[in-house]
C-alpha cells in the first residue's frame, strides 16, 4: 500500500516507518525540516517537508503522494514533562487544525483509510475494570487530563462522523522505548532517578504502556483490519504503586518517595494526583483478536 505518514519524526515515527517498509509498503514521511527529511530518506522512505497548517500545500502533497492510507501521528510535545502545560495549546492546535487539513486532503485525494493517533491512557472505566474500545475518554478528569481527553474525543468524533473514508482510531498507551520520556536518560526516567516522581496516596491509578516498536506493529496491522477503535496497550496495566517502584529498580534508581494526595496537589497540581490515583487501565483484547497483535510484556515489570 502507498502510505503517507504525518508526524514521521516523532517518537513512533522511526519504528513505524521501519515496520511499514518491512511489510512491503511504499512510504512518504512528512516532517518539518531538512535534517529530519534526510533521516527519513536514510530509512528508505520518501520525505516531504510540509507545514501542515497550509491547507493547500497539504492537499498538494497528498495528491502527489497518491496515498491509499494516511497515518496521522501529529504531536507537539516537550522534551521535559514539566513543560507539558506550556505545550498544551500548540499540541491541540496541531492535532485539531493541522490534522483537520490532513483529513480533508486525504478525502479530497481519494485515500481509502485514515489512521488517527488517540489515547489509551485517559480513558474512563468503572473502578477495578479495564477500559475497552467502547469506553469514553475522561473529559471530567483533572484540568489538564480533561483538556487532553476533550481533544482526543473531538478527533474521534470528527473521524467517525465522516463517511468518505475508512477511519481507525489508535488508542495508544504511554509510549516507552527509544526516544520516549521513559527511556533511560530521558525526562520521566530522569525524574525517577532523582526521586522526583513519588507514589501518591494509595497509588491506585492504573497506567497502560506500550513499547513504540509494538505500537508500530499494531498500527501497520490496522491498515488492513476492520475500521474502528483499537486500544494499542500492553498486557500489564499497572497501578502506580506497582509500576513506579519496578521502573526505579529497572533504572537502578532509589526507591520512589511516598507522599499524600494533599502534598502532591500542592507540589505538582491536580493532574499529578489524578494520574497517580484515578487513571483507568485499558484492555488490548480487541487488538490481539483482530490485529493478531502480541505486544511484549512491560519490560521493567520483568526486571
Describe the residue ranges of each PLM region.
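Mid/C-terminal beta-alpha module of Rossmann-like enzyme folds, strongest
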Residues: 2, 15-18, 216-272
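N-terminal Rossmann NAD(P)H-binding glycine-rich loop of SDR-like oxidoreductase domains
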Residues: 3-25
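NAD(P)H-binding glycine-rich loop region in Rossmannoid oxidoreductase-like domains
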Residues: 32-97, 101
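C-terminal amphipathic/interface module of NAD(P)-dependent oxidoreductases
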Residues: 50, 254, 271-303
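Conserved Rossmann-fold NAD(P)-dependent oxidoreductase catalytic core, especially the SDR/UDP-sugar
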Residues: 79, 83-145
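Conserved beta-loop-beta element that borders a ligand/cofactor-binding pocket
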Residues: 118-119, 154-178
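Glycine-rich "substrate-gating" loop/helix at the edge of Rossmann-like oxidoreductase active sites
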Residues: 143-148, 173-181, 202-210
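Alpha-helical substrate-binding/gating segment
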Residues: 188-198, 202-238
Amino acid at each position: 500500500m502507498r502510505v503517507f505518514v504525518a508526524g514521521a519524526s516523532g517518537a513512533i515515527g522511526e519504528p513505524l516507518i521501519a515496520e511499514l517498509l518491512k511489510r512491503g509498503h511504499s512510504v512518504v514521511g512528512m516532517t518539518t525540516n531538512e535534517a529530519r527529511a534526510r533521516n527519513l530518506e536514510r530509512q528508505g522512505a520518501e520525505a516531504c517537508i510540509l507545514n501542515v497548517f497550509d491547507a493547500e500545500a497539504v492537499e498538494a502533497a497528498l495528491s502527489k503522494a497518491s496515498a491509499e492510507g494516511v497515518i496521522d501521528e501529529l504531536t507537539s510535545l516537550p522534551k521535559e514533562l514539566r513543560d507539558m502545560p506550556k505545550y498544551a495549546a500548540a499540541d491541540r492546535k496541531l492535532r485539531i487544525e493541522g490534522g483537520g487539513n490532513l483529513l480533508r486532503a486525504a478525502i479530497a485525494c481519494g485515500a481509502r483509510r485514515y489512521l488517527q493517533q488517540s489515547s489509551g491512557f485517559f480513558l474512563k472505566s468503572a473502578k477495578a475494570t479495564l477500559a475497552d474500545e467502547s469506553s469514553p475518554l475522561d473529559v471530567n478528569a483533572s484540568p489538564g487530563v480533561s483538556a487532553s481527553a476533550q481533544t482526543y474525543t473531538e478527533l474521534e468524533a470528527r473521524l467517525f462522523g465522516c463517511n468518505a473514508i475508512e477511519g481507525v482510531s489508535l488508542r495508544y498507551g504511554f509510549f516507552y522505548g527509544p526516544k520516549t520520556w521513559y527511556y533511560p536518560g530521558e525526562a520521566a526516567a530522569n525524574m525517577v532517578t532523582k526521586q522526583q516522581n513519588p507514589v501518591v496516596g494509595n497509588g491506585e491509578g492504573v497506567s497502560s504502556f506500550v513499547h513504540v516498536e509494538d505500537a508500530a506493529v499494531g498500527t501497520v496491522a490496522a491498515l488492513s483490519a476492520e475500521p474502528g477503535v483499537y486500544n494499542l496497550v500492553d498486557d500489564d496495566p499497572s497501578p502506580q504503586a506497582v509500576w513506579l517502584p519496578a521502573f526505579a529498580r529497572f533504572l537502578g534508581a532509589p526507591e520512589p518517595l511516598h507522599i499524600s494526595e494533599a502534598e502532591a496537589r500542592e507540589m505538582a497540581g491536580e493532574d499529578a494526583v489524578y494520574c497517580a490515583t484515578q487513571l483507568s487501565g485499558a484492555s488490548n483484547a480487541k487488538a490481539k483478536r483482530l490485529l493478531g497483535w502480541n505486544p511484549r510484556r512491560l519490560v521493567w515489570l520483568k526486571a
